[in-house]
Amino acid sequence: MGARIVGWGHTEFGRLKDDLEQLIVRSAREAIEHAGVDPTEIDGIWMGHYNGGLVNDGFPSSLALQIDPKLRFTPSTRLENACASGSAAIHGARNAINSGNTKIALVIGVEKMTGKDTKGVTESLMTASYQ
């Protein structure tokens, strides 16, 4: 038996006033509820997040612990792979499940690109390319 996706959640797309933490919490709570799991059953969190200076928080994986107090002390890992950061998080969680180290994983892909003007976002996105 391999890894499978059993629940999901997402925010609407667009220019949202929510900060990064609010986006993480809102979508992850929805995914946990949709999956029908208790947060105590989650034994690993993988977060795909490309920063590149888009937000001031350089350590967003710890923000996942705000989703539910029951997630306190749950290992949370951030993966960054430019535009494929969310996919990298899925692969990381899948590998942990298939290895037997994790039974139930929470995978989060998050980005906040509307906190800067066009020039600022362009400069941030350029950091994902060879310079």
Positions of predicted regions on the chain:
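Condensing-enzyme catalytic core mediating Claisen C-C bond formation in acyl metabolism
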Residues: 1-21, 30
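Short acidic capping loops at alpha-helix termini that bridge into adjacent secondary structure
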Residues: 38-44, 75, 103
